[in-house]
């Protein structure tokens, strides 16, 4: 066991050769490197698989022995200061390592096919491997300095991956927005680290916790300053995990490739903030009011993320706000002191959300055959629907991920979310009401995404998706409002496929199409897919290749069974509690973690009932027109409600506007913060040019004009110069003679 721990330092560096070799190959042998580019996917998966095996070995030893191992190298600068680097292996490290590697491997396998036609294929895998290295280095860090170094590397990688298609203006703005927003949190994190070093004199976690606890117990610190430093540390987690009010970058991060969205939202960037708070939990629990502040930010994010997801039309943005809300649940659990529940939900949510994002990528991939390589169309749920018969495997996997996030047993997220909901009642009834209500909203918007994507009919054939006018096939629009039906009852799908017979050769001729608006041009037949040397023409979506389906099927297994890790059947079978021992759980200090089946059944029935109610409302509003409700005129009974109809419509429209416009938070930041900063910059520019520069420039101008005046007096004649010279000499001699009399 000791040997395994001694060589654990290699874990963060194993994926690093891939970006280094890709960069070296492109510099020295660019043609050969590009022609053999598919082999880099295998190397990336292979190296990350080795890391996964090492992480699993460490996790098994953690479960059996519950030990903590730390190895440190000292870098002595002088006698008064030494900087130490090392690695820390504990339950939190092993959990995060397995999470990063398992999800990362699935995303890499998926990306090999998803990015196969992209000219940035090599750059993509270089970024991905460096991303894995940065995150693994973060979770194995033994002190705050290492945390900050790898924290910044994670931010740089996310900036590069979000702006992967940097020639698209929208993607370029999105990565800049993510980078600037995280700068705010990272600056707070740096100040907090320096503040605690000033208090304790150490960056090492073990020394930091011990010294700080002694100072607190002896009342030898300024609590106001300590609280400020803790809030600054927490600001880094707020930005990284997209907590209110620094959450605005998360939906725009969807401009990157879909595999990146899966990795960011499941196991890397957004998980970094949760990891930081969990790592520093011994520091936070001894500071008055900071835990309450963490739980407050968490519950606000829970509800805000759910409300903003209600009316999103972009499938990836809807899932992004779902991630924001679920991260709020984790932060709420950490703030309540429910350490086990927070990490349990981090695990279950990671696999379920990775499944949903890879499933959405499969949907987007199939829709591109109809609407082209434009994210505004291929990700728009308005144009989807009726995909069940075209992509059955993707549909079933997406349904399982949806039900898991809704909290339907026995899927993964049910077990972890149910623990957080129960703990919220113990902590605060108000927080409990908000958390349980948001569980219903989660079921509603997730079921809404599923219904709009897979049920009904393929709307792209029935809509003018130019962006100016839409003619929906459904009698209920996206938000449940009345919509116009198709006016042409004899409409046929074949008319969409018929072209001018005389121009038929040009229909299937090779043409250049713009891919994803990122200036990636590809020569291909219109609506044709190359597959094993054969060319097939599609007028409908098609199921993804096996390379993309395999990771989805593996994530289905995780979604089905990973939740059972946290079920405490008996003291010997409670794997998660053994894994996290010793762990911090303020709400259940004296609990032996054994499950009370009566209490569990009662709470589970309540939570499942709320989730079922949200699912029912979604089916009621978004079920296709040829449903039982439509045939029985069930909806018409609610249309004729009399004067109250106007009031209900106003409420409905207000909720829709709030959700679709992102709660007006982005607009507020744009109008007041961004505009204010620009005005301040303009004022600083004016002050610098007109006042600061005016002083030396004014002296220079005065010297110039004075020289011109003196020059004009002389006139440019030598006789005049001699006359003035002797006149001045005579005057000075007279003055000298007068004063010496």
Curated annotation (Swiss-Prot):
GO function term, MF aspect, one: quinone binding
Protein localization: Plastid, Chloroplast thylakoid membrane
Catalytic activity: a plastoquinone + NADH + (n+1) H(+)(in) = a plastoquinol + NAD(+) + n H(+)(out); a plastoquinone + NADPH + (n+1) H(+)(in) = a plastoquinol + NADP(+) + n H(+)(out)
Domain of life: Eukaryota
One Pfam family named in its UniProt record: Proton_antipo_M
InterPro entries in the record: NADH_UbQ_OxRdtase_chlpt_su5_C, NADHpl_OxRdtase_5_subgr, ND/Mrp_TM, NU5C-like, Proton_antipo_N
Membrane topology, from the record: Multi-pass membrane protein
UniProt keyword Transmembrane helix, yes or no: yes
EC id: 7.1.1.-
Gene Ontology CC terms, in alphabetical order: chloroplast thylakoid membrane
Role noted for this protein: NDH shuttles electrons from NAD(P)H:plastoquinone, via FMN and iron-sulfur (Fe-S) centers, to quinones in the photosynthetic chain and possibly in a chloroplast respiratory chain. The immediate electron acceptor for the enzyme in this species is believed to be plastoquinone. Couples the redox reaction to proton translocation, and thus conserves the redox energy in a proton gradient.
Quaternary structure and interacting proteins, as annotated: NDH is composed of at least 16 different subunits, 5 of which are encoded in the nucleus.
Stored PANTHER family: NADH-UBIQUINONE OXIDOREDUCTASE CHAIN 5
NCBIfam families the record matches: NDH_I_L (TIGR01974), PRK06590.1 (NF005141)
Protein name: NAD(P)H-quinone oxidoreductase subunit 5, chloroplastic
Organism field: Cichorium intybus
Taxonomic lineage of the native organism: Eukaryota, Viridiplantae, Streptophyta, Embryophyta, Tracheophyta
